[in-house]
Amino acid sequence: MKNKLRHIIKSCLPHGYIVNRKRNCFLDDYDTWKRSGNSNITFDSHCIFDSFVTIDGYGCSGSSAIMDLLREYDTCTVWASKPAYASNTEIMNGGIYGEFDLCRHTGGLLYIEHMMKEEAWVNDFWADNAVKNFIQAIYYSDIYQNYPSTRPLFFTFFEHITDQRIRCSMPQLNVWQHRFTGLNDIFTLKKMSKTEYYELCRHFLYSLFNMLFADKISGKTLVLDHIFGDCGDDMSRFEPYLPNIKRIIVTRDVRAVYVHACQKNTEWLAHDSVEAFVKWERKMHYRSKHESDNNTLELQFEDIMLNYDREVAKVEQFLGFTSQHHTARKTYLNPEISKSNVFSWRDDKLYATDCDRIKELIPEYCYG
């Protein structure tokens, strides 16, 4: 009843009010930290992890299967969405779960990099917007909310990217952006080269990982969920942020994705018509032009379940692992159980005609 009442109240309040309350709390936290006298922080230049792997997918494509597979290796520490088998006790005892969104989301590290370009640096409106989006993204992040010990790292990064904070009582600079109503301070971005920005981000991420996993490291390869986005760009684009990073992309029969989206009404995945879905999938797959990228491995979800040993061998070769590292084999990913999901989309006859049409339009993304 309490949750229902909270939902009703939130639906009545202007969205901008909620957002600004959150954003202003970040600045309040920051100001308190500055007054504490403990604000002299230097980021780590080395990381406790030797290498990194990001697991990407095209949306409901089964990438969590590879996350579960890599949990079984003693060489890996996995940071991913909470698995079904993780108890609430595990989470309360320090389990770290969730997609890593600090880089890819609006206001994240990649966004700030884009805004660091000369055009944004000289445009006060864009710079102010960039900093406020950063504040919003950080305050809403699970890491900031659930791991308060990391907050000084975010405050320090905030200081590094902002050149000036002008305290104002007049209406905010970007008056047309209602979500910024009530936040009247004006921010400017610090001018820095790409090399300087990459180093800042790299050391910030190292410090964050070192703090979060200081006593939880189970392997020297950190596995992350969609750290830089959804399959786009050659991995060399992201190496300045995290050296020694590789990517595994999991794709799936798009008919299975479509039926799942329809059954669950997955609103962020276009499925109101076959045409809309096909357009979405073409766009998602088009962005992943990585044929010459030696640091990317693409796997088919169906093959992982039906040709388990062969696909596992591919993963091991790609990451430089051996079968001896696979110490918890089939503990988290059991193909004998999971393969029941391979052709389950055929069972729902309601979407049979749609699936036939999808096969006609994009056969290259269908399996079998």
Language model segments and positions:
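Short secondary-structure transition/capping segments
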Residues: W126-Q136, E298-D303, I337-T353
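A polyampholytic, Gly/Pro-enriched intrinsically disordered region
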Residues: G98-L109, L269-A276, S344-T353
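PAPS-dependent sulfotransferases, especially Golgi type II membrane carbohydrate sulfotransferases
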Residues: K2-I48, F52-V53, K289, N294, ...
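A generic structural motif
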Residues: A80-A84, T251, H326-K330
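PAPS-dependent sulfotransferase catalytic core
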Residues: M1-Y198, N334
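Short aromatic-enriched loop/helix-cap "lid" or pocket-rim segments at secondary-structure transitions
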Residues: T89-G95, H260-Q263, R310-V312, K339-N341
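PAPS-dependent sulfotransferase catalytic domain
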Residues: P152-H326
